[in-house]
Amino acid sequence: MKSYFFILVWITSTIHSFGYEAMHEKTPVGTIKILNLPKRTALEASSKVSYFDENNGLFRKLFRYISANDIAMTTPVEADITPGKMRFFVGAEDLEKKFTDSNEVKIKSVPTIKVVAIGIRGGYTKARFLENEGKLYHWLSENQKFEKAGETYGVYWNGPFIPGLLKRSEIHLPIQKKQNPKKKNQK
């Protein structure tokens, strides 16, 4: 019975990974590391409520948009938590296509960014987000080279139909190098 379970897990996770262009590599589960993310074109849906209160509504808005405009799905998607926003990224093959804002989706240019990231396994819950966000803030408090440069956001690698125990995600905290403090008595 155990072997059937592991075969099912392997098949489900393998099938899900086919066909999607990855915008960057996954951060290994439990690992905290610095990533330099490139400039990207995003499709963004927003809500007045928290991402965790949206019940996949943001995902559905974006999915309808990419389906209507024949844009390939990429992974991961990003989500600002409060207020809720979700971003799909446009892959290399679709960048030349002409697409415009809709009532539900806005096109955004996302600049290059340096983040500290933590890899996570499990369902996409507020409790899991807050627990791992705390680990990033602890890392930042222990690291004297960097300071916060923006708000944390979720990075989700799997769609809503993948079982929670198979899901992978990350939390990113934008950072920048600390400015050298001016020395007293320096002219």
Predicted regions and their residues:
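A solvent-exposed interaction/effector surface
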Residues: 2-187
